[in-house]
Every structure is written in C-alpha cells, then in structure tokens.
C-alpha cells in the first residue's frame, strides 16, 4: 500500500468517526431526554 493511499484511507476513517460519533451521542441524548409516549 502506498503512503498516499494509506493516508487517504485513514482520513476517510477519521472523517467518518468525526461525523458518526457526535451524531450517535446526539441521538442517544435526544432519545434519553425526549420522554414522549411512542407506542408502536
């Protein structure tokens, strides 16, 4: 694997983490604080 390719892949991984982790934390916090009655 070339250095530029490994840099590209690692930047993709870190970019995905930077997007996914805060979104997941935000969804968990919203679902914890939002106490509406959701009956399926």
Swiss-Prot record:
It is a single-pass membrane protein. It is found in: Cellular thylakoid membrane. Gene3D superfamilies: Single helix bin. Keywords: Membrane, Photosynthesis, Photosystem II, Thylakoid, Transmembrane, Transmembrane helix. InterPro entries: PSII_PsbX, PSII_PsbX_type_1_subfam. It comes from the Bacteria. The chain crosses the membrane at residues 10-30. GO terms for cellular component: photosystem II; plasma membrane-derived thylakoid membrane. Its main location: membrane. GO terms for biological process: photosynthesis. Belongs to the PsbX family. Type 1 subfamily. PSII is composed of 1 copy each of membrane proteins PsbA, PsbB, PsbC, PsbD, PsbE, PsbF, PsbH, PsbI, PsbJ, PsbK, PsbL, PsbM, PsbT, PsbX, PsbY, PsbZ, Psb30/Ycf12, peripheral proteins PsbO, CyanoQ (PsbQ), PsbU, PsbV and a large number of cofactors. It forms dimeric complexes. Involved in the binding and/or turnover of quinones at the Q(B) site of photosystem II (PSII). PSII is a light-driven water plastoquinone oxidoreductase, using light energy to abstract electrons from H(2)O, generating a proton gradient subsequently used for ATP formation. This is Photosystem II reaction center protein X. It comes from Parasynechococcus marenigrum (strain WH8102). The lineage of its organism: Bacteria, Bacillati, Cyanobacteriota, Cyanophyceae, Synechococcales.
């Amino acid at each position: 694997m070339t250095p530029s390719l490994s840099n590209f892949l690692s930047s993709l991984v870190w970019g995905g983490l930077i997007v996914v982790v805060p979104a997941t934390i935000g969804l968990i916090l919203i679902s914890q604080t939002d106490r509406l009655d959701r009956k399926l």
